[in-house]
């Protein structure tokens, strides 16, 4: 697949989707620097390629660049990406940065887009527990458990 994508890029150097797809390949090969370069090139060629921001954010997060990842997630959202995953990922970063109200809001948007996202309910519950909102946290944990997320059941049995 990489050979084919390289052929396309060599012959059509302004093919944004080819760079985006090669970025995915590099990411899967464990080559994050090359993945970021290709996602960035795809974005330069086609600034409305929303998933390129999302995937670049994922790679940046994996490289511990929380601010870069957050900027990419925010850009994807501001350009109109309606993805449960991008809101979920943004919530994780907000949580790690201690911005719990922003984390809760992001998890809530993730849930609005995909009400079956058990991990979003779970993560929102954890953020709510930290801010002492135990009643709503328990509600989220119950939903997460009902949706099959085993960690929710563990927390319920441990703390409730």
What are these regions (language model features)?
Residues 1-160:
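Alpha-helical tetratricopeptide repeat
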């Amino acid at each position: 697949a990489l050979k084919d994508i390289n052929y396309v890029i060599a012959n059509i150097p302004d093919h944004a989707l080819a760079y985006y797809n090669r970025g995915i390949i590099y990411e899967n090969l464990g080559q994050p620097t090359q993945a970021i370069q290709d996602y960035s090139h795809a974005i330069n060629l086609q600034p409305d390629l929303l998933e390129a921001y999302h995937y670049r954010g994922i790679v940046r997060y994996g490289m511990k660049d929380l601010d870069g990842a957050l900027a990419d997630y925010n850009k994807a959202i501001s350009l109109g990406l309606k993805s449960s995953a991008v809101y979920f990922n943004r919530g994780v970063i907000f949580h790690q940065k201690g911005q719990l109200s922003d984390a809760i809001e992001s998890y809530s948007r993730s849930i609005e887009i995909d009400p079956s996202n058990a991990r979003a309910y779970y993560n929102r519950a954890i953020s709510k527990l930290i801010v002492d909102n135990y009643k709503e946290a328990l509600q989220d944990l119950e939903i997460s458990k009902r949706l099959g997320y085993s960690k929710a059941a563990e927390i319920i049995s441990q703390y409730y």
